């Protein structure tokens, strides 16, 4: 039966709230120009290579929170090293959360982003879980607006490339002792970036991890916390040594149900047209790209199911043909076909499918302004 009823999640509802226009928010983070910006030669080299997340722009947005005074010291300042003592609590207790969002340059030279309200809501969700302070969505979006306007020349105009934005906050108070920090810093940095996976829609090979888990029930799995990603690095290294691009993690209880990749959500396209994705259990990240895909599919009348998906179902389905496509999604890679799925006792391959291509095209066309945005997801920054 096709999905007809859908109750928005808390993040989805918060992300759909109408934001003030960028011009109304501009100026909240006053600019202190960088006296030593990248030279023309350095700038040219960076913009001609566009490696993902390797180089950064001339400035960064910043504000600070204290228990006594709340958020203050807003500004766009020169990019450079941070002053932290070895006693800064983030080094000891991992109070740190982040977001990932992109700025796209359209053909007319304008710069847009995708669902910043959703990212603002998710940052606050993550902050609550790690006992960090929340910030207003206006401050969050204003930090993007003022930062991008200061460094707008760093937004690539190459198709498929973008200025990858990394808002993050961390506990910077100096102490050793297990309690929430009374001083927290928030920053936005940006990296001119090409595609996350160089192969594009050619597909990636995924190793299914049985020994290690990304997160567990009651933990921080639904938060975009740095520690979750640190926990994925060892199995990622081991998978890469076997020739795989990413790791798929299974549930901690039974070790049989798909959860997510190290940094992306998963979808399974059945041959009968049903599209499935692992349900939100508080363990996996509620991805903005995942949510957008679900909404588009539901509006098309597709039978979309958020449910437990056993690994054995997928492997057997690929072998029998009842599973037609498998793909992953996230801000960095958008939509990526999974063309090989392997583990200790199985190894199956599957072709890139038409539905994956269609979803990728529809989503990126909205993001880049090549198609109508019926949801109001795109937001002009500059």
PLM segments and residue spans:
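Intrinsically disordered, low-complexity linker/loop segments enriched in Gly/Pro
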Residues: 150, 170-172
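Helix-start/capping segments and mature chain N-termini
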Residues: 2-143, 147, 175-382
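Charged, gly/pro-rich active-site loop segments
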Residues: 137-139, 147-160
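Extended, Lys/Arg-enriched charged tracts that mediate electrostatic binding to polyanionic substrates
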Residues: 56-59, 156-170
